[in-house]
Amino acid sequence: AARYHSLIAQEVGLPDCLKITARDETGQIMAVQHKQFPVFGVQFHPESVLTEVGGQILKNLLDYLNDLRRNSPKTALKSYLAQVVEGKDLTRQQAEQVMNILMSGQAEESQIGSFLTALRMKGETIEEITGLASGMRKKALAVRGSTDAIDIVGTGGDLSNSFNISTTSAFVVAGAGGRVAKHGNRSVSSRCGAADVLEALGVKIDLTPDQARECLEKIGVSFLFAQSFHRSMRFVGPTRKQIGIRTVFNILGPLTNPASTEYIVLGVYAPELVHPIAQVMSNLGVKRALIVYGTDRLDEISITAPTLVCQVEGDQVSQPFEVTP
């Protein structure tokens, strides 16, 4: 803790838990340190920060904190991992805290892989998916003022080897006068992701939030590259690639559009996900959504077989029904 210039710390009566770490030329106490806990106070004041050594003072503190973080054991995920391994469900609040741990680099790759695998084996609940999605949304780089747009997206992982239908559909909708904030990523467990398609076509995919909003306003469609807007995913991405199986993140991607679109058509890779994901969308505050599964094993609306659909209207979620080509 650093002393504010108008306050005086007396050595007499100083708690035993504190030690003096700095004095001025007259011997007055200027800084103290807790003997047990890494507690710090930083004063951004021109009388200290803008002095000749002010920058070095801040650098020393940041270097120390970085070393402290790098060398500290990463144990925050362990209790949640144990709970899931035992087959116990997480609450929505616990799931959100897990996402905060994952997105903050507080877990080892082995812990992340174990957690994602155990969660899939147990089966993700509606509350768990809602909490994880809420936590991931809070970590995203937001695109403001675009909630009235629509997203057309699929989970991938349907193993159909189809072309990227949702990306193509985004341009059709925009051409018809709609506004599409298309959220997508590179392929992880499927053959081809939205980012792969657009990049191959020469599209600049790494837009800033302002650029993305400008595209949406001018041409009615914008691509929100997950790696640009969910930068904290760098802590999880390598593990997902290594294990190479579907995980809850296949579901979370479509639920975490950085524009927080209130309208969405979302394709899922399995029929048993249609109703639960619709309930999650309602929990997240979406105004209107269609959750779809093509019964010929597509995470899309099929043109060759019936499609299973759940409709979300605010807090109202329909029972699954079929539409046919």
Question: What is the predicted role of each segment?
Answer:
Residues 154-159, 184-190, 229, 295-296:
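Acidic, glycine-rich active-site loops and adjacent beta-strand->loop/helix elements
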Residues 146-153, 181-187, 249-252:
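Core alpha/beta catalytic barrel or barrel-like domain that forms the active/cofactor pocket
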Residues 56, 75-76, 89-97, 106-114, ...:
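Conserved active-site and cofactor/substrate-binding residues in soluble primary-metabolism enzymes
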Residues 73-161, 176:
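Acidic, glycine/proline-rich low-complexity segments that act as flexible tails and inter-domain linkers
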Residues 116, 163-219:
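A glycine-rich phosphate/pyrophosphate-binding beta-strand-loop-alpha-helix module
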Residues 1-75:
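Amide-donor transfer/coupling interface in amidating biosynthetic enzymes
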Residues 138-141, 162, 177, 199-206, ...:
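Glycine-rich anion-binding loops and their surrounding alpha/beta cores
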